[in-house]
Amino acid sequence: MARALGAEVTVGISYKDGKVTKDSSALTIKGISAAKKSLTLSELHTGESGLLTRMMIPLISMIGPGKVHITGEKTLTRRPLKGAKEIMGAFGVGLVPDEAHESEEVFVPLTVEGCVNAGKTEVSGSGGSQLISGLLMALPFAEEDTVIHLKDPKSIPYLFITMDVLKAFGVKVWCDMEGDKEFAESQDWNDCTGMTLHIKGGQKYVAAEMDIEGDWSSASNFLVAGAVFGRVDLKGLDTRSLQADLSIMDILMEAGASLSQLGDDDPKGDIHVQRAPLSAFEVDANNCPDLFPIISVLAAFCQGTSKIGGVGRLANKESDRGKAILDMLLQMGVKAKISGDKMIIEGHSLAQRQLTGKMLRGGSYTSNHDHRMVMALKVAELGADSPIVIDDTDCVTKSFPTFFELFGKIINK
């Protein structure tokens, strides 16, 4: 994507303290000194990434020529961009899909028309944080200041990650959070009812050096595998992270997992998890929907009835993920149902399943071309009565190309 926008990207070279060194994990990007309407491209391809699409819509409407065609592929073209038309319309930008749909939502491919207007605007955050993050990235290029009042915000931690990254590149954005007395006492994201985002206009991005954190979403699959079936040690994670999926640690602790971090108060110390008796848990996953598949598998091995909120956030993922998870659990022989916005799962400990012979059912399963479902299925296979055969495993490369290699190493230890 950086190259498509005109940036120069060098892989395997690091520049630090005036020295050039080889580093296979490094990316060096020479930017394009973007400014309002400085970009001349007419078409942008975002692959299968909903995140990239939603972030790029505000950006290219700000720095693009005023009319840019966005294309995608595979599941992206079947997934509605919930709330995008309404939100971008509030900023004076039109989204025109190539084909008409019965839904009021828009789909890729589409054309982005117009330039983002600064000012005071109120929009809904119920569709998620990705488009809002794109606006936070784009609006510093505007001449005037912007204030966005976000009603019913979701995936709030991701907005704080965006603001943290912007700060690293010299851009000032800040927010006020709203909620009732319960929020004031709990400071729980799920109790927040609104946010007011303040973006100064006329800003410029400055080059910066960044270390990319380990990904808690990917790590969650290994943590659950260790908590249920054996032991796992993970390196490269930061327990001070703003990532929403750090919540997996709280969920595992509530379930009774044996967790520890090596090092004297070192937030980047190795994470150790090992098998322990697990009990049912209750969690609101509205702010960490990517954890839903793997914590559903976790719930199947927790004694008692677990309740996971946030099913409504799953409809427009790579699959209708709520339905896909429920179908997977039922096929495995797990008692589960969706009630309102919650998934209710009747679990049994691994020890009880082994004692009674009621392991999860193996066999042929569909991933629904969803990378997170593939990873959850592979973890579930560890507690199945026969191998689980997944129809499409290639989709896992979207977020974790080396998943099978690393997972295999852990299983063989």
What residue spans do the PLM features occupy?
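Short, structured segments at the rim of ligand-binding sites
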Residues: 1-413
